[in-house]
Amino acid sequence: MNTRVHQGHLARKRFGQNFLNDQFVIESIVSAINPQKGQAMVEIGPGLAALTEPVGERLDEMTVIELDRDLAARLKTHPFLGPKLTIYQQDAMTMNFAELSEKLGQPLRVFGNLPYNISTPLMFHLFSYTDAIADMHFMLQKEVVNRLVAGPNSKAYGRLSVMAQYYCQIIPVLEVPPTAFTPAPKVESAVVRLVPHAVMPHPVKELRVLSRITTEAFNQRRKTIRNSLGNTFTVDVLTELGIDPAMRAENISVEQYCKLANYISDNAPPKES
């Protein structure tokens, strides 16, 4: 028996396809999302409609983004979903979510069982549109969820933790075993809720600076900050900002990374006219 075939569709490895088929898990996810009529619900990677059907039952219309043309075609001809769906057959990484929000006239509620091979870059793409997003619910590799929620002084804490927590409040919802999917992935999964901050707790002046600092620090996470960020900050500056130069990347809080980023923005040499 070919375990990569589900409902007549061959799961494609290059799209990272694993189809959810556990009814209890599906109902738990839909209950956590709690979709309401009139909301701008957007599903990324609907696949064989395991979540699309129960969510669609509660709505008059919804938007889906599906890269696989065969699956997009199946959705278009779905007996009850078809007329309710606006289908974008494209890569979600190329989607302008701000334009979509403007078109739908309200912030988006985004959800999906994300392909694990693109989940991290896709979340970074979505973070750049948090002004247009009300909330997000995603099925992810459990290890990625652990990184999203991790705090300082833990192995899981990294650049993804800092950037995700800069943009959003992050709430784990439930854990999902491999047996809930066809084909069964080799990893544990989990559902997470991300709610963009209405007011940024630690606003930075230039996001690209925060992104650069966290990349530099975590690329050399075993080094002390005095060494990994030594080209940017002197020991005196670190001390002045309340950051021990002997700390490593994983010891520094989101708030402290934001302080470092703002220091660079405030002290950058003026641009030549």
Swiss-Prot record:
Subcellular location: Cytoplasm
Positions bound to S-adenosyl-L-methionine: N18, L20, G45, E66, D91, N113
Keywords for this protein: Cytoplasm, Methyltransferase, RNA-binding, rRNA processing, S-adenosyl-L-methionine, Transferase
Enzyme Commission identifier(s): 2.1.1.182
Enzyme class: transferase
Function (record text): Specifically dimethylates two adjacent adenosines (A1518 and A1519) in the loop of a conserved hairpin near the 3'-end of 16S rRNA in the 30S particle. May play a critical role in biogenesis of 30S subunits.
Reactions listed under catalytic activity: adenosine(1518)/adenosine(1519) in 16S rRNA + 4 S-adenosyl-L-methionine = N(6)-dimethyladenosine(1518)/N(6)-dimethyladenosine(1519) in 16S rRNA + 4 S-adenosyl-L-homocysteine + 4 H(+)
Gene that encodes it: rsmA
InterPro entries, per the entry: KsgA/Erm (IPR001737), rRNA_Ade_diMease-like_C (IPR023165), rRNA_Ade_Mease_Trfase_CS (IPR020596), rRNA_Ade_methylase_Trfase_N (IPR020598), rRNA_adenine_dimethylase (IPR011530), SAM-dependent_MTases_sf (IPR029063)
PANTHER family to which the protein is assigned, alphabetical: DIMETHYLADENOSINE TRANSFERASE, DIMETHYLADENOSINE TRANSFERASE-RELATED
Family matches, as PROSITE patterns: RRNA_A_DIMETH (PS01131), SAM_RNA_A_N6_MT (PS51689)
Keyword S-adenosyl-L-methionine tagged: yes
Protein family per UniProt: Belongs to the class I-like SAM-binding methyltransferase superfamily. rRNA adenine N(6)-methyltransferase family. RsmA subfamily.
Keyword Protease: no
GO cellular component: cytosol
Name the record gives this protein: Ribosomal RNA small subunit methyltransferase A
Gene3D superfamilies: Ribosomal RNA adenine dimethylase-like, domain 2, Vaccinia Virus protein VP39
Pfam families noted in UniProt: RrnaAD
Any one GO molecular-function label of the UniProt entry: RNA binding
